[in-house]
Curated annotation (Swiss-Prot):
It catalyses: RNA(n) + a ribonucleoside 5'-triphosphate = RNA(n+1) + diphosphate. This is RNA-directed RNA polymerase catalytic subunit. Keywords: Eukaryotic host gene expression shutoff by virus, Eukaryotic host transcription shutoff by virus, Host cytoplasm, Host gene expression shutoff by virus, Host nucleus, Host-virus interaction, Inhibition of host RNA polymerase II by virus, Nucleotide-binding, Nucleotidyltransferase, Phosphoprotein, RNA-directed RNA polymerase, Transferase, Viral RNA replication, Viral transcription. It is an enzyme of class 2 (transferase). The keyword Nucleotide-binding applies. InterPro entries: RNA-dir_pol_NSvirus, RNA_pol_PB1_influenza. Influenza RNA polymerase is composed of three subunits: PB1, PB2 and PA. Interacts (via N-terminus) with PA (via C-terminus). Interacts (via C-terminus) with PB2 (via N-terminus); this interaction is essential for transcription initiation. Residues 249-256 are annotated as: Promoter-binding site. Coiled coil: none annotated. Its EC number is 2.7.7.48. The gene is PB1. RNA-dependent RNA polymerase which is responsible for replication and transcription of virus RNA segments. The transcription of viral mRNAs occurs by a unique mechanism called cap-snatching. 5' methylated caps of cellular mRNAs are cleaved after 10-13 nucleotides by PA. In turn, these short capped RNAs are used as primers by PB1 for transcription of viral mRNAs. During virus replication, PB1 initiates RNA synthesis and copy vRNA into complementary RNA (cRNA) which in turn serves as a template for the production of more vRNAs.
Length: 757
């Protein structure tokens, strides 16, 4: 179906045409190789911004640390990290004055959360630095390893299952003279294969015990591993992001809980809400400024950009903020919240894999690990790398760099937003005590500033005052990258505002198309994306209908499942034609089996299997929904699954879609090659962990599953649950006496085995 593109522009207000300026087609750039160079850049830049601070040596780890707090006041427009403690505290105090009781209430909410949060909160999240193996792992595995090591070192508070008790173990672990850990390693030996009589390399996995002294353990506990941020568009250079270990994560989580609770109560905060809710919140602030700028007043808006937000923030400043926010709270609460910023003041950045060298003439490749950078001869490196290494050398310890100032990306988004909002809050007339006043929006490092004044000089003065106030707390507004406009047109967190937020539908374009999970999920995700964009992004009915037809076309080409009566020849067409001919009700065939498309914009919310169920031949129904089909490894599919969709900007979003389990919901098998590496032990641990969790969920279906409050183990909980259920089933006649007796016997056996162990 071809559409004349000029038709799309009839009757559209100009601002809605923003979607046509979309530059990002094709795949975003991904990084390859090592991130060591980018990490060194970050470390060196951060120290440069704070270079006039004071140097100290950490007595425990021997790491040199730079403290820029209360450093010299800036004399130029260069970015700097010299935040002034008294200014930060005063800004936060005024924020409380404008919002009476806000900190008090947020502290109470956070205390409640701390009491109830379970350890498994930390299993959420992707790659995590696993300090026991000194590399990245999935969060669940890293947590399991940490707990295992803690227990074998006599730290057992975590057995209660509460996160706060695991954190108690973390604190105790830092006082221990040594920690014993288990590491995985790989042995290779050459053996003769019995069948082929050739020599082959056989790999075996070993586990060995290793002792870390206090200093080595502390360095690992304070380490953030670094990686290169992938899929960033519109940048020539890549940059490094950090992933902290399990010791830091729990503390950060509680600090962010407190900060999130505060942000929810601040009208200028773009976090933690998102989507339409965020747009509504922001539109309110703009409306307030426009209605209050009477006819005599001018109103201008800055679409703001801050220079290197993270690298100029300072954990010591966050410590001061937390100390103030929690000032009337119980001692234990203040201690728990102050640990994260203290750990960040002493953090170490792991430099990653190191550098790869290759000699073209000798066809040799060799890896220089980060640990060797401290004393390798620099003649092997090019000019720019040599400079980087020279600069970072004084900071190196065991392949990690001491990085006291700066925050690393994405660590304290909520708390830094509170700091930003507290500066916006100072724009009220009762604080500026003059004719200009300001307000605005803040979301992590992104901001929009609205300034009102009787004339242009007033606007200029207001902007200058805002700029200087920010400098005092380590926020550097970039004069080059920010621009000012009459209020009514600005951009904030990729939302474009023009007399109301404009739907920028093109942002969602990359998420249209076939995801490549499997036939069942892809169909469901595809139509859900179109449905969601009709709801949220002004995707009109005609365009949606066109998107749907393009999607079906794309889907058929991807899975080679053109209609059974088509002339197109593919690898599958012989089988699909045969199926088409022997099917009585052809409308009942799924699109992936060569059937027709029955979707239109009115029924996108119905899964395809349900849409066609009544139209299917009976034997086709039986084949399609057959859990015993040996060719399909069935996951137990819940009614709702999550897919990851990629918008053009910003992080990948998780999107729910309906999942109906059919023989099309196949899961590709895992690559075998991993089973021969030292990952194997880890993989087995992970599967075991998974099995335990699945079993536990069988006993406690979500409706009845209240988080256990006592300190019973998972096994005890399941056994007692089994006994209760068996008794109920026996008394209501659902199971026989023999079955009841057998269940009771199994329960007793399990308890006996636990006692013996």
């Amino acid at each position: 179906m071809d559409v004349n593109p000029t038709l799309l522009f009839l009757k559209i207000p100009a601002q809605n045409a923003i979607s046509t300026t979309f530059p990002y087609t094709g795949d975003p750039p991904y990084s390859h190789g090592t991130g060591t160079g980018y990490t060194m850049d970050t470390v060196n830049r951060t120290h440069q911004y704070s270079e006039k601070g004071k140097w100290k040596t950490n007595t425990e780890t021997g790491a040199p640390q730079l403290n820029p707090i209360d450093g010299p006041l800036p004399e130029d427009n260069e970015p700097s990290g010299y935040a002034q403690t008294d200014c930060v505290l005063e800004a936060v105090a005024f924020l409380e004055e404008s919002h009476p009781g806000i900190f008090e209430n947020s502290c109470l909410e956070t205390m409640e959360v701390i009491q109830q949060t379970r350890v498994d909160k930390l299993t959420q999240g992707r790659q995590t630095y696993d300090w026991t193996l000194n590399r990245n792992q999935p969060a669940a595995t890293a947590l399991a390893n940490t707990i295992e090591v803690f227990r074998s070192n006599g730290l057992t508070a975590n057995e209660s299952g509460r996160l706060i008790d695991l954190l108690r173990d973390v604190m105790d672990s830092m006082d221990k003279e040594e920690m014993e850990i288990t590491t995985h390693f790989q042995r290779k030996r050459r053996v003769r294969d019995n069948m082929t009589k050739k020599m082959v390399t056989q790999r075996t996995i070993g586990k060995k015990k290793q002792r870390l002294n206090k200093r080595s353990y502390l360095i690992r506990a304070l380490t953030l591993n670094t990686m290169t941020k992938d899929a960033e568009r519109g940048k020539l250079k890549r940059r490094a992001i950090a992933t902290p270990g399990m010791q830091i994560r729990g503390f950060v989580y509680f600090v962010e809980t407190l900060a999130r609770s505060i942000c929810e109560k601040l009208e200028q905060s773009g976090l933690p809400v998102g989507g339409n809710e965020k747009k509504a919140k922001l539109a309110n602030v703009v409306r307030k400024m426009m209605t209050n700028s009477q006819d005599t007043e001018l109103s201008f808006t800055i679409t703001g950009d801050n220079t290197k937000w993270n690298e100029n923030q300072n954990p010591r400043m966050f410590l001061a903020m937390i100390t103030y926010i929690t000032r009337n709270q119980p001692e234990w609460f203040r201690n728990v919240l102050s640990i994260a910023p203290i750990m960040f003041s002493n953090k170490m950045a792991r430099l990653g894999k190191g550098y790869m060298f290759e000699s073209k003439s000798m066809k040799l490749r060799t890896q220089i690990p980060a640990e060797m950078l401290a004393n390798i001869d620099l003649k092997y490196f090019n000019e720019s790398t040599r400079k980087k290494i020279e600069k970072i050398r004084p900071l190196l310890i065991d392949g990690t760099a001491s990085l006291s100032p700066g925050m690393m990306m994405g660590m304290f988004n909520m708390l830094s937003t509170v700091l930003g909002v507290s500066i916006l809050n100072l724009g009220q007339k009762r604080y500026t005590k003059t004719t200009y006043w300001w307000d605005g929006l803040q979301s992590s490092d992104d901001f929009a500033l609205i300034v009102n004044a009787p004339n242009h000089e007033g606007i200029q003065a207001g902007v200058d005052r805002f700029y200087r106030t920010c400098k005092l707390v380590g926020i550097n507004m970039s004069k080059k990258k920010s621009y000012i406009n009459r209020t009514g047109t600005f951009e904030f967190t990729s939302f474009f505002y023009r007399y109301g937020f404009v739907a920028n539908f093109s942002m969602e374009l990359p998420s249209f198309g076939v995801s490549g999970i499997n036939e069942s999920a892809d169909m469901s995700i595809g139509v859900t994306v179109i449905k969601n964009n009709m709801i949220n992004n002004d995707l009109g009915p005609a365009t949606a209908q066109m998107a749907l037809q393009l999607f079906i076309k794309d889907y058929r080409y991807t899975y080679r499942c053109h209609r059974g009566d088509t002339q197109i020849q593919t690898r599958r067409s012989f089988e699909l034609k045969k199926l088409w001919e022997q099917t009585r009700s052809k409308a009942g065939l799924l699109v992936s089996d060569g059937g027709p498309n029955l979707y239109n914009i009115r029924n996108l919310h119905i899964p395809e299997v349900c849409l066609k169920w009544e139209l299917m031949d009976e034997d086709y129904q039986g084949r399609l929904c057959n859990p015993l089909n040996p060719f399909v490894s069935h996951k137990e599919i819940e009614s709702v699954n999550n897919a990851v969709v990629m918008p053009a900007h910003g992080p990948a979003k998780s999107m729910e879609y309906d999942a109906v389990a059919t023989t099309h919901s196949w899961i590709p098998k895992r690559n075998r090659s991993i089973l021969n590496t030292n990952q194997r032990g880890i993989l087995e641990d992970e599967q075991m962990y998974q099995k335990c969790c699945n079993l536990f969920e069988k006993f406690f279906p979500s409706s009845s599953y209240r988080r256990p409050v006592g300190i019973s183990s998972m096994v005890e909980a399941m056994v007692s649950r089994a006994r209760i259920d068996a008794r109920i089933d026996f008394e209501s006649g659902r199971i026989k006496k023999e079955e009841f007796a057998e269940i009771m016997k199994i329960c007793s056996t399990i308890e006996e085995l636990r006692r013996q162990k």
